[in-house]
Regions:
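Charged, low-complexity intrinsically disordered terminal segments
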Residues: 1-248
């Protein structure tokens, strides 16, 4: 966790045009305070800041952002939006939530993975102990796909109509030559796409597959794809938590 936030904050400090952030929740703790202070400083420099969070994710976490936090952030130039605000009768949409975790900085650098904004990724939790999660930093053409994923949700919630071409990009830096697939699952639109991506990747594997998942509940089709890979001689490594924050 510490490495992710250190790299993220350093990249934010270098931002010149815009910073887009999307998380299931921003927990109101020491990490969020440091992040928002930094974002406010960048906004003061003229950098456009847009941040999106899931309303259910915010309300369900132990230290949610409250109206006074959002008002203060708006006054400091940090534009915040909620994904699918919880309204009565909430049962109709409570399960279609936004779990995307995306940061895009100037169209050059992107972050995605499993971490929200919270200091327990560094400090752990008393009831769980140390917390391990995965996050990746991306440069190169793949960042554009993270941008599209963010803008799709942002525009849906704000009706702003911001297009990728309206986002000021400098020339994208060249990639490393490694292949990266950005797969966006949208509830009610393409619910099967993530499973299909897993199966395609497993069926294409030649040497090794590494899976890290805190809630490993693969469907029958995914289990069969794992079995096929193993039967071909592919080494399959699966990491799951010894102790989970969710009982299932």
């Amino acid at each position: 966790g510490r490495s992710k936030f250190e790299h993220l904050f350093e990249d934010i400090k270098k931002a010149e045009n815009y910073i887009h952030l999307e998380y299931f929740n921003f927990r109101s703790d020491s990490i969020a305070k440091e992040l928002f202070t930094l974002l406010a400083e960048k906004a003061k420099e003229g950098v456009t800041i847009k941040a999106l969070f899931d309303d259910f994710g915010n309300l369900s976490n132990s230290r949610p952002l409250r109206k006074e936090h959002l008002k203060m952030l708006a006054e400091r130039g940090v534009e915040m939006a909620r994904f699918s605000p919880i309204r009565f009768p909430y049962i109709n949409h409570v399960f279609c939530r936004d779990h995307q975790k995306i940061v895009v900085i100037d169209g050059k650098v992107g972050y995605t993975g499993g971490m929200n904004i919270a200091d327990y990724y560094i400090n752990g939790l008393p009831e769980i102990g140390p917390w391990r999660d995965m996050h990746i930093r991306i440069e190169g053409p793949a960042v554009q796909y993270l941008e599209k994923a963010f803008l799709g949700v942002w525009n849906k919630e704000t009706h702003e109509g911001l297009k990728e071409g309206q986002v000021p990009h400098d020339t994208l830096c060249e990639g490393s030559g490694r292949r990266v697939a950005i797969v966006q699952r949208i509830p009610k639109v393409c619910p099967e796409i993530m499973r299909e991506a897993y199966i395609a990747a497993l069926d294409a594997a030649e040497r090794k597959v590494q899976i890290i998942n805190p809630y490993f509940t693969p469907t029958r089709k995914v289990r069969n794809a794992i079995k096929r890979a193993a039967e071909r001689g592919v080494r399959v490594e699966i990491m799951i938590p010894g102790k989970s924050d969710i009982s299932f």
